[in-house]
Curated annotation (Swiss-Prot):
Species whose genome carries this gene: Macaca mulatta
Catalytic activity as recorded in UniProt: a 2'-deoxycytidine in single-stranded DNA + H2O + H(+) = a 2'-deoxyuridine in single-stranded DNA + NH4(+)
BP GO annotations: cytidine to uridine editing; defense response to virus; DNA cytosine deamination; innate immune response; negative regulation of single stranded viral RNA replication via double stranded DNA intermediate
Protein name according to UniProt: DNA dC->dU-editing enzyme APOBEC-3H
GO MF, one annotated term: zinc ion binding
Amino acid sequence: MALLTAKTFSLQFNNKRRVNKPYYPRKALLCYQLTPQNGSTPTRGHLKNKKKDHAEIRFINKIKSMGLDETQCYQVTCYLTWSPCPSCAGELVDFIKAHRHLNLRIFASRLYYHWRPNYQEGLLLLCGSQVPVEVMGLPEFTDCWENFVDHKEPPSFNPSEKLEELDKNSQAIKRRLERIKSRSVDVLENGLRSLQLGPVTPSSSIRNSR
């Protein structure tokens, strides 16, 4: 497996709200680990966006090409620099529904267009389809650093300090994701409340009108 350079990890998994000078594009990068339930050696790799395909679509195609044994279960963990867009979220849900022997977990360093309703709905769609989406914290950044980065040459930064910095920055992003997830809980609670209250009668409608 080709490994990431320490510089690529530092730049692309950078989860600061704003990039410091000199500015650079924070690209979509996906690191995946496929672990068979029988205890065999995990398969790892990483993918990035290409002109026509997002990293998530390339990941789906990569897993399909492996010809996995459908009688065996696999744990799949993905570390993404950006959370999936709505289109990719839908594709991932369809993929997992068609491949019940795969258990997919997604961890993102940053939330992509998190303020847009359709991007929030994409995240909720994944979570509601048994595809957990979480923000990367210290355990995930550490695992990504240890298993997907080439350590032949010493990095230009202190790895421990970098990982602690990433974990510190992730706290606000985690709270942001929890607020998004709470929307689905609110919608469900409101729906149940409406069912319990039953239809609004004409008289009550008049009393509650403004």
